[in-house]
Regions:
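Flexible, glycine/threonine- and acidic-rich loop/arm segments that mediate assembly and lattice contacts
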Residues: 1-321
């Protein structure tokens, strides 16, 4: 049906205001399950050091009445270290861009700072998860922290051709070592239970199982030992609260989206208080020198992973995602 004669409609109108919602919708994931769950610590040098120790195994102990005391052997602590890594995000906005009226935000620089801050934390989570050996650094090469997988030497399970765990701190070089790649396999409850037992026997008290999303779906099929609630009143910074009830205690099963990006085929069994994020320079926002009609801001953090005792943790290698 045609319009009546001389109809004036929106197709001819000049000066209609643009209809642009004054809200920006962003659903990109920003959660950082490991970084948000572990404690913070203070680093005072680019080479962040700490000590680890252990107890002797239990043994028979009976002393003859009236006998002279026999001195026990003493063992020295182990001194280990990781290097701080500088991470940043830099924003450059023209003076005009800062002045114009932009939809969805009152201040373009403030909006970009908030956005880049979240991205910086995601990069930190990536650094914990992606296999990365520690690097001393030089005037031409950045210092790098040794990631979680490069520290765990005692408790773990690798694919058929992977053999014994090869990672861990190398006292001779002062650097962390890489894991050995094995045959890819699907996660099973037997694999999980085996590593949990190894950690328990080594003295660990696991409370967190971090997995890629697809592996989380498989773990959820371990119906006999999985519940969908957490400790009453506990406040956590990650969404999932599924709990795997092992023979040695309850362990929260936490899906990690960033794990899917690394393609490392790893899952971590962690005792949260036995690792920390150690900050040499905490998060800061620095206005850089003005060189023209623009504003330049740097978001910066310098930090490292403090693996307080690798025997408290476990790793599942060569797990299909």
């Amino acid at each position: 049906m045609a319009q009546p004669s001389n109809m004036f409609d929106t197709f001819e109108t000049v000066g209609l205001r643009e209809d642009l919602a004054d809200v920006i919708y962003n659903i990109a994931p920003e959660d950082t399950p490991i970084l948000s769950a572990i404690p913070r610590a203070k680093a005072t040098s680019t080479k962040h050091e700490w000590q680890t120790d252990t107890l002797a195994d239990a043994a028979a102990n009976a002393v003859i009445e009236g006998d002279d005391a026999t001195t026990d052997a003493l063992a020295a602590t182990a001194r280990v270290h990781n290097f701080t890594q500088i991470m940043d995000k830099v924003i450059l906005l023209s003076g005009t861009q800062s002045a114009v009226d932009a939809a969805g935000r009152a201040d373009e620089m403030a909006y970009q700072i908030a956005k880049k801050s979240k991205e910086l934390k995601k990069d930190m989570e990536f650094a914990l998860i992606k296999e990365n050996l520690s690097v001393v650094g030089t005037a031409t090469a950045a210092r790098e922290l040794g990631s979680i997988s490069t520290w765990i030497a005692t408790n773990g399970s690798a694919g058929a051709s992977g053999g014994a765990l090869s990672a861990g701190f190398n006292a001779a070089t002062g650097l962390t070592r890489a894991t050995a790649s094995g045959t890819d396999r699907n996660i099973t409850e037997d694999i999980l239970k085996s590593v949990i037992k190894d950690v328990y026997e080594a003295g660990g008290d696991l409370d967190m199982f971090v997995v890629p999303p697809s592996v989380k779906q498989t773990v959820s099929t371990f119906n006999a030992n999985t519940t969908r609630f957490g400790p009453a009143g506990e406040k956590v910074e990650y969404a999932a609260i599924d709990v795997y009830s092992s023979d040695f205690g309850d362990i929260q099963v936490v899906p990690n989206r960033i794990m899917a990006l690394t393609n490392e085929k790893m899952c971590f069994l962690l005792q949260r208080d036995m690792l920390a994020a150690a900050y040499l320079r905490d998060f800061s926002i620095n206005e850089l020198a003005k060189t023209g009609d623009s504003e330049r801001v740097q978001l910066l953090v310098e930090w490292t992973l403090e693996m307080r005792n690798e025997k408290a943790h476990g790793i599942l290698l060569d797990i299909n995602q």
